[in-house]
Amino acid sequence: MQGQKSHSFKLFLWKNIFVVGASFCAVFFGLGFNSNEASALFVPTLSASVDQTNLQVNGNQVINSTDKTTEIPFNFTVNTNNRTGYTATLSSETENTALTNTGSLTGAKIDSISANLTLNNLPNNTWGYKFGASTNYAPIPALSTPVQIVQTTGKTNGNESNQLSIGMKLADNLESGNYINKLVISVISNPYERRAVMMTGKDFNRKVDSIVTSLSNDDGWGNKESVSHIRRSSASFSDIPAGAIDVENDEVSDYPIKIWYDATNKTIFYWAEANKIILNRDSRYMFRGFTKIEDIDISDFNSSEVEDMAYFFYKMKSLQSLDLSSFDTDNVTDMTGVFAYANSLKKLDLSNFNTSKVTNMSAMFHSMADLDELNISSVNTRKVTNMSGMFYGVSKLASLNLSNFDTGNVTDMGRMFSGMNSIQQLDLSHFNTGNVTAMNDMFSLMTSLTQINFGANFDTSNVTDMTGMFYQSTSLVNLDLSHFNTRKVKSMNSMFSQMSGLTILDISNFETPSLEDAGSMFAIDPGFSDNLEKIYVNQDFDTSKLTTSTNVFIRRNRLRGGNGSYLSDPSTADKTWLRVDRPGAQGYFTRKS
């Protein structure tokens, strides 16, 4: 208990003058803490006061007034640094809620109202209270049933003032005397569990740079090549090495968090008195560049508040296994590159991940070259807008089940599956791509891919970039593009380049009023088989906006137009060859109908 103030609330009758006075007992409780916890950073405080400790009213003036009512405002002020705020309650000091005439032989009193009422509707010789801007007065609560009048959720910004008002209505029949009661305002700090909160991921990473050896530079970032392990230390506070440094968020953490480097064991140790370490909302880059890490203990990290997890495990190239069963991702919105270049991980289980708030999954699994088992059955993609490079370079994964993917909000699928050269079949029948604008290199370098099921909702009507979309997908023999709408596409550069498995390409539904770049669109390079013989269309390409058309058909020596036309050196074909071959108008296309 930090303080107590006590005064009386009285009603006097003297020479036909009634004086009503108010007093309050204000009780304030602060948060206690264990003084033996020498490492604790944060000490909660709480103070409170009232600006009028003895309210008085001239009863005669009230009775002689037009409506026989009065309203007495007063303020109570609270100041606390408690991070969960405070709760204030109001009650009478006893079970008696009336203003009692202590000298009356008949037990005269001013009763509390029994229901919420406006001031003018108060019964004669009653009183009540109201809080703030409320228009109604409430009954005076008894000691056993205090009423909560304020509850906050955070520390005050300096002194926080709250207004209460006492209202009453008096009548001519009120017995002369001295009317008394006492009210109690209790201000209690809300329960608060002190926490160890980590600094931002980027700051943590830089702190590690400052204590480890064998750093190599990577675009201004240190690759921690001398670190093989990250583990929690069970040392007592007094046994922490002198060279340990602080990595807590000093604005919100109640405990210090220490890290140090053990060169003998090539280990980064972290230490905190708290059982769990709360990861920062911004944990981007936290473990970026631990290129030689073999194992990492994250079981005591609480990630429930993390919003940005981008590049969290980026370039952990030597990590063999990763247990994410304790990870809480409920609030994460950005998972860009979170596992990118963790290219020694063979298995990754995200079955416990809640990704319902994630909007960015670009490069999420980028270049996980050894990954051959991926569980993403529970991944929620409903809010995701960016999937660019999501599975880029996941070269050993032989199957990918995307049946649970909701892609209705995705706008960027560029390079999404590029380099997945062990995938043979890709089922996108559940994909809704109506909002996608970028599909550049989406299926490029998928050298084992033999079948893509696009489905009816694979909508390309808003796509503007199809650059390299099927580049070097050398095993595709059949390609059903019958649902493709290409009216907004500006670039088809290298779209079908290096597709050595195709003999026939049907793009009969293609329309190109926006096309600006068709460079190397059907090109084949040395070392790739040239098998393409026919390209079916329904109409000439619209080349009115075309600015780049070099090497469109380079080395396509087997390709013939519908009327048999071809060039001995296909690289010399200009944009006029992007048309149906017919007498008087040579082209490399064949009319389908």
Residue ranges with predicted function:
Residues M1, V19, F28-G30, V57, ...:
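Intrinsically disordered, low-complexity segments enriched in small/polar residues
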Residues M1-L41:
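Sec-dependent, cleavable N-terminal signal peptides
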Residues K5-K10, Q151-G154, D427, S475, ...:
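Intrinsic structural disorder/low-complexity segments
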Residues L11, F76-V78, A88-L90, Y129-F131, ...:
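Generic structural hydrophobic/aromatic packing signal, biased to beta-strands
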Residues S39-R194:
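Signature of Gram-negative chaperone-usher
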Residues Y192-S593:
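Negatively charged
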